[in-house]
Amino acid sequence: MERTFLAIKPDGVQRGLVGEIIRRFETKGFTLVGLKFLKVSKELAEQHYGVHRERPFFGSLVEFITSSPVVAMVWEGDGVVASARKIIGATNPLTSEPGTIRGDFGINIGRNLIHGSDAPETAQQEIALWFKDEELVNWQPHITPWLHE
């Protein structure tokens, strides 16, 4: 079963949107297998956003993600990476479709509420960076047979 990494960023936590964001993935039928509420260290932030190290916004990105707690999550389900990206919406909330998290709640590109893995390979790397194996729970909700063929 495919897994993805999602993180509700400091703006999503501060605005009280954690429950609403989690609800969207639960009602879609995905299974939550890992959840942490944490203050991100500078080291973790720099590792996570390492691909942007040479970009001019890298410093402000690290500063923002370490400014307040985040909710780190691992979700599981068929096609969860691509589906999560659709639920989240475009990176820039101003171009995100209504009905997406960013389209409904996002304010600007620097405060876009949530991070989601962009590919299955990236998801595996991000999950390994943020979670130890023993922090992930292998379980199946009773409704699973009603969601999958």
Curated annotation (Swiss-Prot):
InterPro entries attached to this UniProt entry: NDK-like_dom (IPR034907), NDK-like_dom_sf (IPR036850), Nucleoside_diP_kinase (IPR001564), Nucleoside_diP_kinase_AS (IPR023005)
Ordered alphabetically, the record's keywords are:
ATP-binding, Cytoplasm, Kinase, Magnesium, Metal-binding, Nucleotide metabolism, Nucleotide-binding, Phosphoprotein, Transferase
Q: Under the cellular component aspect of Gene Ontology, which terms does the record hold?
A: cytoplasm
The protein's location, in the record's own words, is:
Cytoplasm
Name the Gene Ontology biological process terms: CTP biosynthetic process; GTP biosynthetic process; UTP biosynthetic process
For activity, the cofactor(s) needed are: Mg(2+)
Q: What Gene Ontology terms describe what this protein does at the molecular function level? A: ATP binding; metal ion binding; nucleoside diphosphate kinase activity
Top-level class of the enzyme under EC nomenclature? transferase
Is rRNA-binding among this UniProt entry's keywords? no
Ligand binding (ATP): K9, F57, R85, T91, R102, N112
One Pfam entry for this protein is: NDK
Q: What is its EC number?
A: 2.7.4.6
Q: Which residues form the active site?
A: H115 (pros-phosphohistidine intermediate)
Q: Which reaction does it catalyse?
A: a 2'-deoxyribonucleoside 5'-diphosphate + ATP = a 2'-deoxyribonucleoside 5'-triphosphate + ADP; a ribonucleoside 5'-diphosphate + ATP = a ribonucleoside 5'-triphosphate + ADP
Q: What job does the chain carry out?
A: Major role in the synthesis of nucleoside triphosphates other than ATP. The ATP gamma phosphate is transferred to the NDP beta phosphate via a ping-pong mechanism, using a phosphorylated active-site intermediate.
- PANTHER family for the chain: NUCLEOSIDE DIPHOSPHATE KINASE (PTHR11349)
The family assignment reads: Belongs to the NDK family.
Q: Which NCBIfam families match?
A: PRK00668.1
The subunit field of the Swiss-Prot or TrEMBL record says: Homotetramer.
Protein name (record): Nucleoside diphosphate kinase
Query: Native species of this protein?
Result: Nostoc punctiforme (strain ATCC 29133 / PCC 73102)
